[in-house]
Structures are given as C-alpha cells and as structure tokens.
Amino acid sequence: IALMIMFTVFNAFSAFAPTFNTLFIARLLSGLPHGAFFGVGSVVASRIAEKGKAAQAVSLMFMGLTIANIVGVPLGTFIGHNFSWRISFAVVVFVGLVTLLSLKLWLPALEATKNRDLKAELSFFKKREAWLIIAITSFGFGGLFCWISYIAPLLTDISKFSSEDVPYILILAGLGMVVGNFIGGKLADKFSPAKTVIYILLTMALDLVAVYYLSSIQVVSLTLVFLTGAISFAAVAPIQMLMINTAVGAEMIASAAIQAAFNIGNALGAFLGGLPLVAGFSFASPNLVGTGMALSGVVLVFIFIQYRKKVVKLQAIQTT
C-alpha cells in the first residue's frame, strides 16, 4: 500500500509539473516503487495462494502488467495525442487511487516476518545461490531483449512490413505475453521452478533461431512475434518462485532483486544484440546473440541445481 501511495502521489506531481525539470524528477520518483512493488507483490501472492498454486498466483499478479502494456500504453498515447499529456497522468493517478482502495478492501492482513531486519535480509546476498539466480535472469532472459530491442527494424527490413503496421503487430507480442505468463505459472506449479526455467530457456533459444531464419516469411514472422512474447513471459513466475523458495527469510528483498536483474538483462540484451548490427550484419542477427544468452542461462540453472543440492545435503548433515 505504501508503494502504491508513492506511485500515485508522484504521478500526481507529474500531472501538475510546471516545468520539464520538475516533470523529469517526478517521473524518476514515480518509477522508484516499481521493482519493490512487484517484488513484494510476488511474495504476498505466493503467501495467500492455495497450496500448490503459488506460481499461478504470482503469474496472475504479473498478468496485470501484461494487460496494462496492451491496454494502458495505447490508451495513454491516444489521450496524450488527442487531449493533453497531463490528462494521461491524471488517468494514471485515478487508476492508482482505485488500486489503493482495492488493496485496502481486499488484501488480507499477513503476519510480518519476525526477528528480521534489513541487515539480516541483505545477508542473503552473501550466498552464491542469490547471485546465480540473478545471473540466470540477467543473462538467460537477456535473450528476450536481444529480440525486442530491435523488433521494429526486424519487422520492417526483414519481414517487409510497413512502419505503420509495427504498433499493431506488437499487440500480438503483448497478447503472447499474457498467455505465456499464465502458462508459466501453471508449469512452475506442476514441475518445479528450476526445471520450468530450463524448459523455457531452451524453448526461447529454439524460438530465436527460428526468428533468425524465418522472419522473412510474413505469416511465420507474425506467428513468431506471438510465440516469442509468450515464451519470454512464461519465465516471469518461475524465476520469481525460484528466488522466493531459495531466499527463505529474505523473500521480499530477494524478490525485488529479480526486477533489477531483469533490467540488467534489458541493458545486456540491447548492448550485446547491437554488436552484430554495428559489425554490419542484418537486423535478424541480434536473435542469434539472444540464442546464446538463453543457452548460457540454461547452463547457469544446471550449475544452480547442482550447487543447491550440495548446500541442502550439507545442511542435512549439520542438523544430524
């Protein structure tokens, strides 16, 4: 609730900002709660979920993000273009107030974690498992950002769509993200978060190879836009649950760290994916880099699983 208050208040400042500098600062401040909100939200969703459905609960929470991308972004653009950018922010403030009221009315009271302070939670990052999961997220899912960072020129230069078609095609990616997010939660509950992440990253690698070789065929390209969006967001709930299950006693801060790891992956994917373009290769080439990043994530998950087994075995010996 506190994070939503911050989000709503700072967006209100944006709506009434008298100068560009004020608007810039207000936008910066309104973005601060983002990672913490989804980190805390993931933990809360997993705690209030039915037994065996924690990952599905997390995926439902993130489904709001995917739906917002499909509906909110074009709606905000439409309002800003036809009316005023200030009204766009006013709508965001209204949605924030509705969300606050909803949280107050329907979010159940959860018992706070006892005997934990910030120092104790930060100690989780002394563990190798924490950094392995962050690396899995940053490198493995950096493959997604190799694709999405250069999707517009891929669609226009390789698939030969017009630039006017691109915004509508991206709706397909958004729809795929909604579907994939839901499927990923079910898979993580059925199997395990670690195994699910492996399956998704392997599928992502194959998908990006297909994007590289087949995007010149328009019908196939459209299909791959949907599939790539679905595959990429199928990973969100499993990787969150992998971190939550590993960071016992430090779930909140560890879950928020995943959001930072995704942002690192965003930067890495855009940078590494751009290198072949600088070297003169086609706009399909970033997807081969993305394939390599996805496969590197698979290797890191296997390393995590083996290391985790050793830790659990050692803990079992110490308690006997």
Model-flagged regions — what are they?
Residues F78-V93, L275-A294:
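A membrane-interface helix-boundary motif in multi-pass transporters
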Residues F20, A26-G64:
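Cytoplasmic helix-loop-helix junction between adjacent transmembrane helices
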Residues F16-T22, K160, L214-S215:
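Helix-breaking motifs and short loop linkers at transmembrane-helix boundaries and internal kinks
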Residues V93-A112, L300-I305:
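C-terminal membrane-cytosol helix-exit motif in multi-pass small-molecule transporters
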Residues I1-A12, K195-V209:
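Structural signature of the two symmetry-related core transmembrane helices
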Residues M6, F10-F13, N21-S30, V219-L227:
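Paired small-residue
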